[in-house]
Amino acid sequence: EMSASLVGSEMCIRDRMSPEPKERNTLSTYRMTFAYIGSFVALLLFMPMVNYFKQGHSEQYGWMMGVVIIAVMCAALFYGCFAWTRERVKPIREKQSPLKEDLKDLLHNKPWWILLGAGIAALIFNSIRDGATVYYFKYFVVEEEYSVISFFGVSFVLSGIYLAVGQAANIIGVILAAPVSNRIGKKATYMGAMMIATVLSIIFYWFDKGDIALIFAFQILISICAGSIFPLLWSMYADCADYSELKTGNRATGLVFSSSSMSQKFGWAIGTAVTGWLLAYFGFQANVVQSEETIHGIKMFLSFLPAIGTILSVLFISMYPLSEKKMKVITTELELSLIHISE
């Protein structure tokens, strides 16, 4: 996590590459698409690499070499990112402001607070669904009754396939985010996706353990909705940086994005903790036949509980004030300020 935070500046550069909101949507879409593709590729290739390198060695060596290969690939891609991107948007004030002043400006940035709440709620939604998947398939669906599927020499049970399908559907959602938001706006797209995810999540509760086709179909639809919101969030964070620069003269792009990234990790941590607490509350005990109350609780993890997260996210984003029309005004005023300074 610490190394990921150190290289997280690639998230901050998008608002410096273009001042146009639609172009930022496209940049965010590319970024999130390849992020999900990278995760999907790593999921498929990691175990085959472990199996290859452990031949003639220990399994520990195989895992270590798998991590080394992934790390080298990541380093090369990060260097490529920074070598082949350019900052084209000039700030109003070239002089770097003190961190204390940046923090003060951030705390007075109302749109950022709204996105903070929406992002945390969205991550709670995601983390609860993903965190409970193994329990849902092991104790409710009883995946042991189904055949194991092998792919690239790796055996996948139903829960693994379910998560992989969700990851692939996330990519579809990311790709759809830019064209849809460019047509109806980021706020409307975000709210629409989360409201659809809410309805689908609630319906999910009533599936029987034999409704495998429906379970996977709804996973695809919900994951498309979930995937579409994150490029929109990052694009809106860039708008928050513009808003802050216009109001204070201080852009503080790095702080806006790094604090937002931290808040999303916070949301994931909350969702994971809630999953553990509620499993204990519903009387869960590992590797035994679960009671009816516990099964009810496990079903809640993939239905009503994540729906609470989506509803909270919709409530937050409904208050977001930076519409496309408002951003055009902000962008124009920033450009006029730069012209005035240059004269």
Language model feature labels by segment:
Residues 132-157:
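Short amphipathic helix-loop junctions that connect adjacent transmembrane helices
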Residues 196-210:
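C-terminal ends and interior cores of transmembrane alpha-helices
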Residues 28-47, 260-275:
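Glycine-rich segments within core transmembrane alpha-helices of 12-TM secondary carriers
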Residues 5, 9, 214-230, 236:
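Hydrophobic core of transmembrane alpha-helices in multi-pass small-molecule transporters
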Residues 173-186:
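Helix-to-loop junctions at the C-terminal end of transmembrane segments
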